[in-house]
Regions:
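A sequence/structural signal of beta-propeller blade repeats
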Residues: 1-119
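C-terminal closing repeat unit and adjoining cap/tail of repeat-based domains
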Residues: 117-235
Length: 235
């Protein structure tokens, strides 16, 4: 048999009062593994597709569909439900994506979905939810509490808008690994408006990360002509 090529999709830490561990999610095939200090081997926690992963407040979270799961460490590590979709949120594995983000210590989820405009054309829409861990539910949110969120296909980060003059608060910035970036560079949650970022970089330049998008917006580096296939992974 030939060697299997594994691609790291997400990595995070579990660091609470009872345990410390490293969690790694490999895609294609999807498998979540975990190891604690002193372990001789990785333990398989979950086989299947996870749509987003993030570490927040010493916990490791992931999405199965649009349900938010938490990695629970005990003698047998396992995923437990942290926030369940109330079934009022429609999720399509083919057309939608979900993105967890640690927003200054508060866990949030961005739902990227497809809808139709008045001319029946397909367009992207973005719904944001706070993950209420006490209630175990997703609560609709209309802002990022004054912060800005930079979203890539595999990683999403939150930054303080006031730290950078060129960044708008309560705004979602799309990474160059999303096709709609050419028409929707940034999306304001307050007024639901979108605006194209001044960006001459080619959508065919891969791999591209959310860090690339963040750098462009902060320093105004909208032109990458002359750069040869930048290696800007999300790690």
């Amino acid at each position: 048999m030939g060697e299997m090529s594994l691609e790291v999709y997400g990595i995070g830490l579990v660091d609470d009062a009872s345990s410390m561990a490293v969690a790694v999610y490999f895609s294609d095939p999807g498998v979540l593994v975990v190891a604690k200090p002193g372990d001789d081997a990785w333990a398989v926690v979950y086989n299947g597709t996870l749509y987003s992963t993030v570490s927040s407040a010493g916990r490791f979270y992931c999405c199965i569909g649009i349900d938010v799961m938490m990695l629970h460490m005990d003698q047998q590590p396992r995923l437990l439900m942290a926030a369940e979709n109330s079934k009022s949120i429609r999720f399509s594995q083919m057309a939608h994506s979900v993105h967890l983000v640690d927003n200054a210590g508060e866990l949030m989820l961005v739902h990227r979905l497809t809808c139709h405009d008045s001319q029946n054309n397909h367009k992207r829409k973005y719904e944001v939810y706070k993950v209420d861990l006490d209630a175990g539910a997703l609560v609709s949110a209309k802002s990022f509490d004054g912060r800005a969120v930079f979203m890539g296909r595999y990683r999403t980060i939150s930054v303080a808008a006031e730290a950078f003059p060129s960044i708008a608060a309560d705004t979602l910035y799309l990474g160059c690994d999303f096709a709609e970036r050419t028409s929707t560079g940034r999306y304001n949650l307050i007024d639901r408006s979108s605006r194209l970022i001044n960006d001459d970089s080619s959508a065919e330049m891969y791999p591209c990360s959310i860090i690339h998008c963040l750098s462009q917006c902060i320093w105004g580096m909208g032109n990458f002509n002359g750069l040869e296939h930048p290696q800007c992974n999300d790690a």
